[in-house]
Structures are given as structure tokens and as C-alpha cells.
Amino acid sequence: MSEKIRILCVGAGNMGTSHARAYHKLDEFEIVGIVTRSAESREKLNEELGGGYALFDDYASALAETKPEAVSISTYPDTHASFAEAAFDAGAHVFIEKPLAETVAGAERIVAKAKATGKKLVIGYILRHHPSWIQFIELAQTLGKPLVMRMNLNQQSSGAAWETHRNLISSISPIVDCGVHYVDVMCQMTRSRPVRVSGLGARLTNDIPEDKINYGHLQVAFEDGSVGWYEAGWGPMMSEMAFFVKDVVGPKGCVSIAAKSAGAAGSSDDVDAHSKTESLLVHHGELGEDGTFVKA
């Protein structure tokens, strides 16, 4: 591999743009091309990064022409499996945004291809590397068992944000899009195996295909008796009351993410705010002999 990792950036949405900005700034990387379906998005990103990058509207052509050492895939989930496999076949390492694929079979196929080609596969689980979320998980692990984990991320979207959500819904539901993060967090908090999953969804608008939903919630039961709940909905009809709940309760107390700004009215569709924590609120449930809290 060369001194700089020659990387092909695929996708220029919220995450694709963030990754490209990082690659542009890091001395260890050299962007060899930007691939998007939309000419407007790739030209806008190229201009922001100072121009001069090779631009493509066809992924296969970009792979063949640039011969990258690594590919960063931040596209809609229905392209993840095929794009990752093509990158491995081209001899490149892969960074891919979550979810890895639309199905378990698709995910297993990508992992098998990575092993067969001897290339690295990295999946974008940002909360696993977020200092505040790491501490949130560590504090949850001190609360005893079982845990009750309550989380949601509803987004009241309109204009361009609702257009993005409608397009995304054609490929993935809200409950899966961010739910993969929060179920992963629940697994880390409990360090236990999920034994039962249930969920419900609803189609709250005629602006999306008849077989799609824009609201859902799921429940996960764990082997150790812990239970988790996650809710997500997108659209102009969504409530902004308690749309940013990140709360864990155990026998010894509870810990919550208290993000007053990120959880304020009018900010539910602000993607940049979704990973902000601001502060962690810890409550100790121990009672003294007089029946009052030992710690205020």
C-alpha cells in the first residue's frame, strides 16, 4: 500500500460528506474520486473540498479508472452489499456505513467476501467511538441487572429534510436506520444475548410507497432479564415531545443523556445534533434507614 491510502468516496449525503471532509483533511488519505447518483451533490462536495477531484456517476467505472486501495461507501442500504462486493473484487479495503446490508444473508456474504479476499471491512458504528456514549454505557453497567433501556429518535422533518427521509424510506425504515446503533448499545450495556425481538410499524402519510412505514418501535428481551425499547419516526406529522430519550434504569438507579440543546423543540431533524450528549444525569436509587435517598 502506498504512503497515503488512495480512497474512493461513494455517496455525498450527510455521512458521505462528513467522511469525505475527514479524508480531505487527513494526511494519511488521498481522495481519488467522488461517486454519486446526483451531479449536484458531487459537484457541491467537490467545490467545498477545493475542487480538482475526479467525479463519477457510475460506481463500476470509478472503480476501474481510479483503482483505489480503499472504498468509503455511504449510499442507500439497498446498494451496500453489491458495492462492497465489487470493492473487494477490485482489491480494495472497505469502509461502509451501517447497516452492512438489508438482510442477514447479504451481511454474511459481505463478511465472507472480505475474508476470502483478505481485505479489511470496517462498519460505521460511530457511537462505539463516541467518548460520552462510551461513558454512558459504562455507567449503565454499574446499575445492576436487569436493565430497562428506553431510547428513541423521532424527527419532525419538512422541506429538504422530509425529501431526504422519503427517499431513504424507499430503502430502509426509520426503525432500522438508527435502530442498529441503539440495539448495539443495548447489547453493550447488558453484555447479554437478545432472546426475543418484537416490533410494530405504521404508515402515517400517503407520500411514501404503500408497502413502507415512516414510524416504528421495537422491544428487545435479553437473556439476563433486561428489556430494551426503541422508537423512531420521520415526517412533518411527528411530535417533538420527548423525541430524544436516552434513558437506562437498573436496580441501583438510572443514567440519562440530558441533551437540552439537541433535545430542544425545532432540532429533531438536525442530523448533527443526533450524536450530541451535552451531559449525563446519574440518579442513585439507594435508600437509607429513614427511607430517603442516601445520595441526593
Language model feature labels by segment:
Residues 1-50:
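N-terminal Rossmann-like dinucleotide-binding module
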Residues 19, 40, 51-113:
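Beta-loop-alpha module in the N-terminal Rossmann-like domain of NAD(P)-dependent dehydrogenases
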Residues 96, 121-123, 230, 257:
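Hydrophobic residues in well-ordered beta-strands that form the structural core
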Residues 109-126, 144-151:
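Rossmann-fold dehydrogenase core element
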Residues 126, 222, 245-296:
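C-terminal glycine/acidic-rich active-site capping loop/insertion
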Residues 127-210:
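Predominantly a Rossmann-like dinucleotide-binding segment in NAD(P)-dependent oxidoreductases
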Residues 183-266:
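Contiguous beta-strand/loop segments that form the cofactor/metal-binding neighborhood of enzyme cores
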